[in-house]
UniProtKB/Swiss-Prot annotation:
Stated family: Belongs to the TonB-dependent receptor family.
Protein name: Hemoglobin-haptoglobin utilization protein B
GO molecular function: siderophore uptake transmembrane transporter activity
Source organism: Neisseria meningitidis serogroup A / serotype 4A (strain DSM 15465 / Z2491)
PROSITE patterns on file: TONB_DEPENDENT_REC_2, TONB_DEPENDENT_REC_3
Length: 810
């Protein structure tokens, strides 16, 4: 495997070169160590952690989560179909195994368990993704790679993405009592237009912040080079004068799974962030926050399996979808600072959050013109609501000694959650949908549940020796998560019998740990080490989802254990006037992965674990029984390098700089029988090279990027958990590719900034691995033809596209 190690060798070479160019760094007034602020004199890089501040978000023209991680090869975005993305992939795990928090508040869990996807996900009737957030609301994003439940709680198996919202203090002060920022622009890949306003003010101890953003666009374009492929049965080609009928001339053309173009879509997003605060004095402050964000996506699902015929006789429907992602949050916060006392700073916070993930579906018959006013449309609605109420108390204390500093961060918190769903369907008159043509069928597709959690933590940073030569971190956290299925008066006795432990709590509790060591062994070089753990409590659908059906009987399993992870890292870092670099190696071990497991055929013996009663009380015999169970383990290991070199250190023009960011990772899953198998969620190695120039006047700058990504070899994939001996069939379309991007900015005076970027300049056609592994082999959505792979080009990434923004600040 010579190719994957080329970027690593280059990384090592640059690492050796940096110390030669290093010089004294500028003094730093404060140092952040695991989010504990301590006095220091130099800047330390942390293993597995990157902070992206507002200035960088603007520079990178970040408009969504794909832009956020575009040039970070150690993290990728999980594709979630027409409704958007579904979280992130870090170090071989994805979705709910990577924590996502906004101001410390966990975001919605997905409906991504194997059981849910087998039963419902393949048909597109649910918006089962994790919610996303508006980039203009954030002052900083921290990406943590590697298990990190000490800081991020449940879900941080592979890492975490932590967003921090803007505050009035980011813009106003005693010297500047007001701020007004206006921003607008366009995004070429999805014909997006957006506008945003940020206003902040301060008066008599009162301060306020308002961020309002509106976006609208269309479907994300692809780079298909072919027309829509025709798949014909028995060698026949459709002839409109022939009366053979659709069964003889089944043909997929512009619609159906062989469609090569993305489905037509229009979407709109509106987001509001409002903060209000009052400073009683320099030591006491109270604040209030309100967030409201809604995204509506309207899709004409032409690639749906049932929209696949173009013969004269209608055999399918036109399917239209409206997917809604809605989030509302309100909270109150109190801050206190003491010169002498049990804490230097105290923060008390209470938040309430509501997240709705909804899908409306309309099936319109193809022959509606023949039916006229009597035509009917089938309508279904699937609604998932997740409510959260959370309180936290965070404390910080620093003690200074003659040759040491001890900084402690400790606190506790808790909360409760409520998962509810509403599902119904009916027929209505096509030309007047208010007139129902059938009864409204209300059903419960998912078992509703309640949850509670509480936690306490203690995190310490020790600075030892003169000049902060040694730094040691050590922390511990305790979590207890519990959930219970809600009882419903409408449940029959038989249904109650299908839900184990109905109404009683099932709890998961344990400790998370984190330690770190930083040895500054020369003026500019640091040796870094880190150990951390993570856990993920089972999601609601992993625990309580059941499906009593003779062909596929799914049993709920409230006895699941939490998934666990342990992470080790060792690194070398350097910084100076010539730039900075960080080279690290890591290994992570996972265990108790939750997977859908075939238990065998059913039994009518109530004491048998395969006992399978139906809703009417009938016990099934010889039906296949499945259940979510803790089964496999896994390990991943790899190497990462990122660095920036200021080229004026070797005599080139001031402001010229270059950079390299590389990630290489490999790993295996270990099955119950000890066999090791590939992990589909591992991304192929990627290297990002950059070359840029920032004028010393700071009026303008330009940056060029080259991204090289290797192919995902079929031998590094598995077909499914039921077929571990064969590769993922669409992996053969994964090829190595190189992308070239260019971005620039121009400051006009002190108030106005223009930014522009061109992506995929060479108009390269390529598939990302995340896109290929999102294709389904069964169901009705995200499909291609299983035999010929016709329609595969629908999953190509965008070709050449352009972004533009203009921003004015006053």
């Amino acid at each position: 495997m010579p190719i994957p190690f080329k970027p690593v060798l280059a990384a090592a070479a640059i690492a050796q070169a940096f110390p030669a160019f290093a010089a004294d760094p500028a003094p730093q007034s404060a140092q952040t160590l695991n989010e504990i602020t301590v006095t220091g004199t130099h800047k330390t890089q942390k293993l597995g952690e990157e902070k992206i501040r507002r200035k960088t978000l603007d520079k990178l023209l970040v408009n969504d989560e794909h832009d956020l991680v575009r040039y970070d090869p150690g993290i990728s975005v999980v594709e979630g179909g027409r409704a958007g993305s579904n979280g992130f992939t870090i170090r071989g795990v994805d979705k709910d195994r990577v924590a996502i928090n906004v101001d410390g508040l966990a975001q919605a869990e997905s409906r991504s368990s194997e059981a849910f996807q087998e039963l419902f996900g393949a048909y597109g009737n649910f918006n089962a993704n994790r919610n996303t957030s508006e980039p203009e609301n954030f002052s900083e994003v921290t990406i943590t790679k590697g298990a990190d439940s000490l800081k991020s709680g449940s879900g941080a198996l592979g890492g975490a993405v932590n967003y921090q919202t803007k505050s009035a203090s980011d813009y106003v002060s005693e010297d500047k009592p007001y701020h007004l920022g206006i921003k607008g622009g366009s995004v070429g890949k999805n014909s997006q237009k957006f506008s945003s306003i940020t206003a902040a003010g301060r008066l008599f101890g009162l301060d306020a912040l308002l961020v309002y953003t509106r976006r609208f666009g269309k479907e994300t374009k692809n780079r298909s080079t072919e027309g829509d492929i025709e798949i014909k049965n028995d060698g026949y080609v459709y002839n409109p004068t022939d009366t053979g009928g659709p069964s003889k001339y089944l043909t997929y053309v512009a619609t159906g799974v062989a469609r090569s173009q993305p489905d037509p879509q229009e979407w709109v997003n509106k987001s509001t962030l409002f903060k209000l605060g009052y400073n009683f004095n320099d030591q006491n402050r109270i604040g209030w926050i309100f967030e409201d964000s809604r995204t509506d996506r309207f899709t004409n699902e032409l690639s749906n399996l049932w929209t696949g015929t173009t013969t004269s006789a209608a055999t399918g429907d036109y399917r239209h979808r409206q997917d809604v992602s809605y989030r509302r949050r309100s909270g109150v916060e109190y801050k206190n600072e003491l010169e002498h006392g049990p804490w230097d700073s105290l923060k008390l916070r209470y938040d309430k959050q509501r997240i709705d993930m909804n899908t409306w579906t309309w099936d319109i018959p193809k022959n509606y013109d023949k039916r006229g006013i009597n035509g009917e449309v089938y309508h279904s609605f699937r609604h998932i609501r997740q409510n959260t109420a959370q309180w936290t108390a965070d404390f910080e204390k620093q003690l200074d000694f003659s040759k040491a500093v001890w900084a402690a961060q400790y606190g506790l918190g808790g909360g409760k959650g409520d998962n509810a769903n509403s599902d119904y369907s009916y027929f209505a008159k096509l030309y007047d949908p208010k007139i129902l043509a059938s009864n409204q069928a209300k059903i419960t597709m998912l078992i509703e549940n309640r949850s509670k959690y509480k936690f306490a933590y203690w995190n310490n940073a020790f600075h030892l020796g003169g000049n902060d030569r040694f730094r040691l971190n050590a922390g511990i956290r305790y979590d207890k998560n519990s959930s219970s299925a809600k009882d419903d008066p409408k449940y029959t006795t038989a249904i109650r019998g299908q839900i184990p432990h109905l109404g009683s709590e099932r709890a998961h509790a344990g400790f998370s740990y984190g330690t770190g060591f930083d040895w500054r062994f020369t003026k500019h070089l640091h040796l870094l080490a880190k150990y951390s753990t993570g856990f993920r409590a089972p999601t609601s659908d992993e625990t309580w989802l059941l499906f009593p059906h003779p062909d596929f009987y799914l049993k709920a399993n409230p006895n699941l254990k939490a998934e666990k992870a342990k992470n080790w890292e060792l690194g070398l870092a350097g910084s100076g006037k010539a730039g900075n670099f960080k080279l690290s190696g890591f290994k992570t071990k996972y265990r108790d992965f939750i997977e859908l497991t075939y238990m065998g055929v059913s039994s009518d013996d109530k004491n048998n674990p395969r006992y399978a009663p139906l809703s009417d009380g009938t016990a099934l015999v010889s039906s296949p029984v499945w259940q979510n169970q803790n089964r496999s383990a896994a390990w991943v290991k790899g190497i990462e390098f990122n660095g920036t070199w200021n080229l004026d250190s070797i005599g080139l023009p001031k402001g010229l700089h270059t950079g390299l960011n590389v990630s290489y990772i490999k790993g295996k899953a270990t099955q119950n029988n000890g066999k090791e198998t590939p992990i589909n969620a591992l991304s192929p190695w990627t290297a990002v090279y950059s070359l840029g120039y920032d004028a010393p006047s700071k009026r303008w700058g330009i940056n060029a990027y080259a991204t090289r990504t290797a192919a995902k070899k079929p031998s590094d994939t598995v077909h499914s958990n039921d077929d571990l001996n064969n590769p993922w069939p669409y992996a053969k379309h994964s090829k190595a590719y190189t992308l070239f991007d260019l971005s620039a900015y121009l400051n006009i005076g002190k108030q106005v900034t223009l930014r522009a970027a061109a992506y995929n300049i060479t108009n390269k056609q390529y598939y990302t691995w995340e896109s290929l592994r999102s294709i389904r082999e069964f169901g009705t959505v995200n499909r291609v033809d299983n035999k010929t792979h016709a329609g595969i080009q629908r999953f190509t990434s965008p070709g050449r596209s352009y972004n533009f923004t203009i921003e004015a600040k006053f």
